[in-house]
């Protein structure tokens, strides 16, 4: 008996197959071989075609099915890039490309809504400003593409769209409503006042399900095309960051997870609804939330994380080095990169900077001393500095990151990055044998009742490595961090 996990990223789509009795991943497929394109028709825009995601979901399932018959699949879980807008016609066709998470076009619309609804009311009820989230993106479509808006039957998130393609049912989740800024935390219900402010008909908002539990069943078309038996439950759905926390068994108040993909995230669980007055970090409904046992996730997002490292590889390393070689060369430079700084904020508006687009930068280059190796190290340190910057904000909300859990993937594959982050934050970093697709598969098995308890679901989760702070590097990194903060403040003033 198997569980299928699907991870819709912005760079790739991964599909993993979990053997439920052993808890082991028996197969996985990641597509495409190169990164999926992100279309940017204007500065600050970012779009992807939902049909592209669905294409690569099918490709991955077919690749796995060569050796593992899909008739063995007993549950399906989906995780996805958060906040993206998918607008569907009554026939279920996408009416435009998805405006994805790193698109900044709706920042001004969100700011207008915050002032009109009232900052205090928003922070009390939605725990966030409307910002650049999904509802604001839809309001942009209403204002700028009225002919498309008029045809919208339902709007949803990227993972909701994949669930629809598998089942024929248009739905979202309560956690999903919260990431769209359409959840009222105080009243424990949909935040219709946000939709009303934007002129969004309530009928456009899909029904919302729990994240862990049966939400829909696959249809006959999925069985014909992919071999997954009709009636297979879709029993888990979560945005990539709540899912990353779930994958690491970060479910209780005080526990903290991190990831370093295209964007970087620190996600801390609390049982008390808390809001940052400046909305630099955001609070969402966690996957195991219930009214009687509330669980919320405070999310710090740095848009320019893995994408910064990827840019450095393309434009500095000239793609002659893989990431492992880049890490080795970067490690040849001392902590602090001998004064060279990289500011990684070049992938849209950064919430942690008050929704500003400051741009990225390489600062303090000494033409007589600094080399490619310095730039490689400074890039990873700059990303770690941005994590520290946000974690200091989270500390102000009562979270204390003494231990940070992460999957051994993406930037956390870099010994230099994880060592730098541990030293800067003073936290122990624990690395585990999991990823988003595998976590979604585990969640689906739990949601379908194939695992009876959380303890059973996570029995096979293994800690692979522990990274402790390095005292000898602390002074150099603290000095680098202070200089980096000064540069960020200068960029904020000029933005």
Please provide the spans of the model-predicted regions:
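N-terminal glycine/serine-rich phosphate-binding loop of ATP-dependent small-molecule kinases
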Residues: 1-96, 151, 223-224, 228-233, ...
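Active-site core segments that coordinate phosphate-bearing ligands/cofactors
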Residues: 3-5, 17, 107, 111-169, ...
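Residue-level signal for inorganic ion chemistry
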Residues: 23, 49, 76, 103, ...
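Structural signal for short hydrophobic segments within the conserved structured cores
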Residues: 26-29, 206, 465
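Short beta-strand-loop/turn "lid" adjacent to the catalytic site in phosphate-handling enzymes
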Residues: 44, 62-101, 127-132, 159, ...
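Short loop/turn motifs at secondary-structure junctions
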Residues: 69-72, 204, 384, 400
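Short, glycine/charge-rich flexible loops or terminal/linker lids adjacent to PRPP-binding catalytic cores
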Residues: 103, 216-221
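A conserved helix-loop-beta module that forms one wall/lid of the active-site cleft
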Residues: 198-210
């Amino acid at each position: 008996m198997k569980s299928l996990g699907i991870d819709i990223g912005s760079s790739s789509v991964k599909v993993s197959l979990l053997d439920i009795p052993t808890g082991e991943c028996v197969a996985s497929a990641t597509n495409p071989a190169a990164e999926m394109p992100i279309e940017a028709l204007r500065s600050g825009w970012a779009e992807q075609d939902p049909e592209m995601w669905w294409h690569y979901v099918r490709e991955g399932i077919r690749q796995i099915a060569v050796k593992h018959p899909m008739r063995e699949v007993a549950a399906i879980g989906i995780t996805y890039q958060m906040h993206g807008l998918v607008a569907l016609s009554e026939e279920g066709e996408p009416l435009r490309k998805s405006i994805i998470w790193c698109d900044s076009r709706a920042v001004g619309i969100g700011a207008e809504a915050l002032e009109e609804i009232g900052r205090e009311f928003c922070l009390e009820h939605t725990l966030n400003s409307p910002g650049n989230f999904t509802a604001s993106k839809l309001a942009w479509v209403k204002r700028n593409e009225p002919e498309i808006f008029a045809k919208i039957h339902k709007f949803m998130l990227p993972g909701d769209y994949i669930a629809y393609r598998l089942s024929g049912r248009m739905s979202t989740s309560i956690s999903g409503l919260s990431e769209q800024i359409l959840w009222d935390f105080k009243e424990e219900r949909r935040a219709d006042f946000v939709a009303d402010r934007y002129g969004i008909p309530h009928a456009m908002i899909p029904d919302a399900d729990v994240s862990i539990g049966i939400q829909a069943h696959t249809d006959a078309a999925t069985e014909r095309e992919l071999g997954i038996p009709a009636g297979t439950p879709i029993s888990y759905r979560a945005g990539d960051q709540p899912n990353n926390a779930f994958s690491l068994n970060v479910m209780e108040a005080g526990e903290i997870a991190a990831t370093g993909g295209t964007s970087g995230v620190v996600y801390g669980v609390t049982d008390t609804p808390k809001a940052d007055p400046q909305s630099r970090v955001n609070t969402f409904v966690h996957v195991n939330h219930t009214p009687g046992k509330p669980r919320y996730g405070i999310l710090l997002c740095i848009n320019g994380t893995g994408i910064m490292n990827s840019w450095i590889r393309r434009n500095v390393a000239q793609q002659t080095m893989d990431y492992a070689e880049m890490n080795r060369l970067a490690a040849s430079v001392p902590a602090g990169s001998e004064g060279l700084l990289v500011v990684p904020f070049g992938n849209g508006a950064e919430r942690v900077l008050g929704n500003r687009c400051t741009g990225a930068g390489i600062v303090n280059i000494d033409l007589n001393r600094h080399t490619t190796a310095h730039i490689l190290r400074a890039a990873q340190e700059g990303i770690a500095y941005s994590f520290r910057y946000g974690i200091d904000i989270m500390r102000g909300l009562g979270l204390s990151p003494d231990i940070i859990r992460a999957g051994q993937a993406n930037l956390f594959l870099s010994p230099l990055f994880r060592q730098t982050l541990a030293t800067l934050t003073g936290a122990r970093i624990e690395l585990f044998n999991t990823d988003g697709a595998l976590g979604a598969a585990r969640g689906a098995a739990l949601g379908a009742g194939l695992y009876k308890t959380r303890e059973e679901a996570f029995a096979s989760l293994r800690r692979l490595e522990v990274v402790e702070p390095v005292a000898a590097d602390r002074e150099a990194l603290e000095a680098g961090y202070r200089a980096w903060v000064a540069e960020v403040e200068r960029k904020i003033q000029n933005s």
